[in-house]
Amino acid sequence: MSSQDPLLEARLQREARFHDAKYSGADLYPRHYAARPTQYVYTQMRDGLGDLHGKRVLEYGCGEGWITRDLARLGGQVCAFDISPQAAENTKRLLAAEGLLERCSVDVMPAESLLYEPESFDVAVGFAIIHHLDLVKALAELHRVLKPGGVGYFAEPLATNPLIELYRRMTPQFRTTDEQPLVLSRLPSLLSSFRSFEHREFYLTALAAVAMTYAPGGSRVFPALSAPLHRLDQALLRAVPRLGAWAWYTLLKITK
């Protein structure tokens, strides 16, 4: 985790400690996670990946390893990494149990200083990870390791809904001090070195279904309530794209 930048080094150490605790079983998940609300966003991302046979895939922030497992099942030769040694260990354990470890490598390293060769990946994937990073350094590294024409898919929380920001301020125990959800208006400058990017937003009116998970029995009704709201959201966002700034999540597709 060594870095020549002492501020970045301190940040990396804080992130590693937080996520080591999280993946060691500490109660660091909000209540609404029991309803798995981000599964809908992940499904959209996974479906966009298509067949990964013959492709080298880089996974950012492997966490518990379930995305790593899916990438391997889709045929990818996966290189996964995390800042947390505990996350890397959990991922290796899951892959070994499912007979997929030979298709994957799992390492501990910072996204701001990757140990991979230039232009060595066809695809990069990350879920709720890049908002934890020094974006300028991490995106420069992403550009370096992607092949020409390579694609990065990242699902990330957004920063500009005031109700979500209020909730975040009220629940600091569930997040790190350094994380910074994304702002859509900043994407063009952040991604200027890439050939193109596109994004789709999720959870506008469907945030009401997430809020319901805090009511008694709310997690049980979440699937039935969220499905029509997702359809409404997509119609609203097609009609008025600028409403995306008020959404909870964005799904980025970045092409080198």
Question: Which functions belong to the PLM regions below?
Answer:
Residues 123-136:
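A short SAM/SAH-binding and catalytic strip from SAM-dependent methyltransferases
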Residues 136-151:
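A short glycine-rich, Lys/Arg-flanked "PGG" loop and its adjoining helix->strand segment in the class I
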Residues 109-123:
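A short acidic, Gly/Pro-enriched loop at the edge of an enzyme's catalytic core
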Residues 179-200:
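Short alpha-helix
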Residues 58, 64-113:
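Class I SAM-dependent methyltransferase SAM/SAH-binding core
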Residues 201-256:
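A C-terminal cap/extension of S-adenosyl-L-methionine-dependent methyltransferases
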